[in-house]
Structures are given as C-alpha cells and as structure tokens.
Amino acid sequence: MIQFKNISKHYQLKGQTIHALDQINLDIPAGSIFGIIGYSGAGKSTLIRLINLLERPTHGQIIINQKDFTALNAQSLRQERANIGMIFQHFNLLQTKTVAANIEMPLKLLGYSKIEREKRLMELLDFIDLTHKKDAFPDELSGGQKQRVGIARALANHPKILLCDEATSALDPQTTKSVLALLKKINKEQGITIVMVTHEMDVIESICDHVAVMESGHVIETGPTVEIFSNPQHPTTKTFIQTVLQQHLPVNILSKLEHQHHHSIYRLQFLGKSAQEPVIQSMIKQFDISLNILFANMTEIDGTVIGQMFVQLLGDDTLIQQAIEFLERHGVSVNQSGEQV
C-alpha cells in the first residue's frame, strides 16, 4: 500500500509561498490501478512525483509497504526506487539509442550482466509486441510504439509500482485504447500497482478501479471508481463525470420539452444487477402508467455496468409513486429532475 500522511508541498515563487499540495491524506491499495484526476494546476503531477521522491514533501510522510520513504537515507532510497517504474507523457526516450538500448538502459545502470540484459530485453519486446523494432530508433516509431518502449523500460527491473504521468494524453484515441489495454494486462498478470495521473475521465472509466479527484492542491473526493461514478458528491467530480456519463438532459431535448405539456422528468440510475434485468418492462406491466424515454446511456466500469435513463412518467400520481417505489425496491435509483443527484 502507498500512503500519503498529512502531505503538504510548498514552493517559493517571487517572494510568495505557493501551496501546491495541502494536507493530503490518501491510501492507494496494493495491486490496484489508481487514477488521480484534476485540472491543470490541481497538484496531481506533484503528488505522483512524491511517491518516488522526485519531489520531496514540505511536510508529511510517504509510506510504501510500511516504509517511510521520507526517512530513508540516500542508499536505501536508491534501492527502494529500483522497485518503482515511471512512464511519461512525452516518452523520454534517448533519440540516439535503439529500442533495445533504451529498454536495456536501467538494467545497465543496475549492474545486470549482458546475458541477463539480453534475456530480459527479449521478454519485454515480446510482451509489448515490438520484437521486430528491436534495432529501430525512436524517430522511426509511432507515438503508441514509443510509449510501449517507455513501458518496457519502466518494467525492466520487475518493479512493484508503475507511475504513469499523463501517459496517454499525447496519443490518439485508438492508440490510447491499446496502451490502456497493455497497462491493464500488466496489472492483471504481474500484480503491479499502477498509479495514473490524467485529466481525461475516460481514462479513469476505462482502466481504474479506484480514483482520487484533486482541486487546488486538495483531494476533494476519493473511492472505488464505480462508487464515484454512480454517486459523485463534489461539483468538480460531477463535471468530470459529465464528460463520459451524461448527468443532465441534453439541451436540445430540454428545449423541445418546453413546448410540451408539463410532466415530471425522472433520472433513473441502474447499477450492476439492476442494469441487466428487465425492471422497466416489469414496472410497465404491473402499473397502469406510460413511460417516455427521453435519453439513455450505459457504460461498464471495473466490471460493473452503470446505466441511466431520463424518462417522463405519465399517468395517475398515486400509480406513478407506486411505480417509483417498485423501481427503488429493485435497486434503481430514482431522482426527479432538478433534485440533487
């Protein structure tokens, strides 16, 4: 487990104190894919760089597997850093070195023999599916291939933790998808804890099982990704989720409804089992009401299906209330439009 305990990071800039991080307390479970999301300047990149002490906190402790990294001497810290790999937005490959030389570099620095380096190199090239690019130079690679080389280099010494700082933000959507699939494979097959900094909520949706939302140097919300998506509390979190999971009726639909007879609009949210059962069909059969579907969407997060639907319920008020209670008994969250959701 990675633990941030009362972490603060302050900078001096033109005579002023900048509070990059302020009183951060956060636990990252071992073996998880943990996303850290926030807008530019939120402090997320500073936070991830504290894990391997590329940045040192002004106050607080970084505890990894029950070791306080902030209390380690230089030699002990070097040894512990060997268990932490890192990949970057712009790949950070040596342009004058081949793919093989880039991947082997950390192994050379750590004193691996030539035979050991060659063996590990071929394992990694096979794993990232770039054996045919062994002797190529970075300029001959696509963005996705460069990032795969960066990932292989980060994995060279069998790390227990992999830090990803905006690792997909320079890639096109299809390449992003393939890189995320590779990271998920690494986590599943090797049990490596992955910490991902991103400003893209679809990255969190695609791969992360836990997430922390940051704003102005604070963690404003954190928890399992499914819980955060299904029940966001902070306005900033809701804004992020809105980019991948519609939380409000689209404006064009609302404008059409303005000219229709008023009917209450409800937001129905289905989670897990309720998203896969014919709950709506059962409700319509049981109650003498009509249902007008205005908008619906569905996604899968960490193996759990989340669906939501904006509907008008038409009919007798008593029957509508009974229908709502029926839905809630069957695991559907019901909120009338305009209520806090």
From Swiss-Prot:
Keyword Cell membrane included in the entry's annotation: yes
Binding site residues for ATP: 38-45
Cystines in this chain: none
Keywords for the protein's UniProt record, in alphabetical order: Amino-acid transport, ATP-binding, Cell inner membrane, Cell membrane, Membrane, Nucleotide-binding, Translocase, Transport
Topology in membrane: Peripheral membrane protein
Protein localization: Cell inner membrane
Pfam families: ABC_tran, NIL
Assembly: The complex is composed of two ATP-binding proteins (MetN), two transmembrane proteins (MetI) and a solute-binding protein (MetQ).
Family: Belongs to the ABC transporter superfamily. Methionine importer (TC 3.A.1.24) family.
Physiological role: Part of the ABC transporter complex MetNIQ involved in methionine import. Responsible for energy coupling to the transport system.
Protein name in UniProt: Methionine import ATP-binding protein MetN 2
Gene name per UniProt: metN2
